[in-house]
Structures are given as C-alpha cells and as structure tokens.
Amino acid sequence: MFLLRSRFSTGFSADVAALWQRLPLLEALLNDVAIIFERDPAATHWLEVLCCYPGLHALVAHRLAHGLRDRGIPFLPRFIAHLSRFLTGIDIHPGAQVGRGVFIDHGMGVVIGETAIVGDYCLIYQGVTLGGTGKETGQRHPTVGHHVVIGAGAKVLGNITIGDYARIGAGSVVLRPVPAHCTAVGIPSRNVCRCNTQAAPLDHSQLPDTEAAAMRSLLDRIAVSYTHL
C-alpha cells in the first residue's frame, strides 16, 4: 500500500520523512496512486497514472477544495469543484468527506453529494451516485464505510449507512442501510448476507441474485408438494 511512499522516501533524511506529516495533500496523493496500482491491472507507469486517471484528478481537486472550505474560504471551493467536474466528468461537492486510498475507476458520471462520507479504500465505479432524497437539511447523503465496493451505475440515496466491506451491485438503487460484509442488489435493493464468505473486491461475477434465489426456493417448495400428492 505504501510502496510509492517508500520509494520516494528511501534514503532521505528524517527531515524529509517528517515532511509527509506537514503535507497531508501529498500523503493522500501517494495513497491514491498506490491504490490504483494495487487495483487496476491496466496501470503500468506512474506518469500514466498521474496524467491519465480522471478519478485521481477529481480526488486531488476535491481534497484541495475541501481543505479550503474547512478554512471558511468562500466561492473558491465550489469553483474548483465546478472546474474539476468540467475536466473529469466527476462531481464531488467540496463538503463531502472522502477517506484515503479511494479509487474512482473510470469515473464518468460519478456524483458525491455535500454531506456524503466515504471511508478509506473504497472502490467506486463509473455512474455511481451518492445522493439525497429531497430538500431536507443536515445529514442527507449516505455514509459509506471502509473497503466498500460500489458497482457501476449504482445509486445510494438518503441518510443511510453502508457498512464496512459491503458491496453494492451494478445498477442497484439502495434506499436503506446495508450491514457490514453484506451485498445489496436490485431495484430497490435487497440485502444479502452470507456467513463465513469473503469475496474478492474486484470480482463482480459472484454477486448474489435474490430473484433467482427466490425462484429456486419456490421451485423447491413445488417439488416437495408434488412428493406429498
């Protein structure tokens, strides 16, 4: 995870090592770059990652805008977010809280609302919306835990919590909380929790099909009924 950091810091003095603590944006950037190499087999060179990954660009712009907003600076945070959306196709409100090591893969069409919270090392695919459900004030966007995978086109709406290591199936519409280590699939989504199973975060071929499971259960009950006739 910290391979890039070690490459840059190896052989430098303690003063340079302490510099990481004073430059949180640089620390976050190295974490974001490292997670891209870990999760994207298409990433082959650091220069390519720095120049050609819009998800990385959007996160860098957001961290800058968020920091300025926290300092009470008007206008500039929203302008940076607006410019970032124009350049990357990714809309992250400056008020959103985004953890470290987040990977926005492909990214086009991703929307993250003002009061959304995204935990560390989450994987977000293109077309994802972390949005609200109306004009309510206060916390009105989702809180996403750590190591969560949100599939392409999924919509997570309202003041709900997505637990750590949860998975959201592609195209799902999530309107209620998802417990940790569970999967939400469907429109509207249904939670499926499998005990003692740990799926690879990048493997979307093993997502549970709740409709198919219900059909199998119905067919099994019909078969049992026939045996008693």
List the model feature ranges, each with a label.
Residues 2-36:
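Soluble, non-transmembrane catalytic domains of enzymes that act on hydrophobic metabolites at membranes
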Residues 25-61, 65:
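Membrane-proximal helical "anchor" segments flanking the first transmembrane region
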Residues 227-228:
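Conserved small/polar residues in nucleotide/adenosyl-binding loops
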Residues 177, 181-223:
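Acidic, low-complexity intrinsically disordered segments
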Residues 85-192:
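Structural signal for interior beta-strand "rungs" in well-ordered beta-sheet cores
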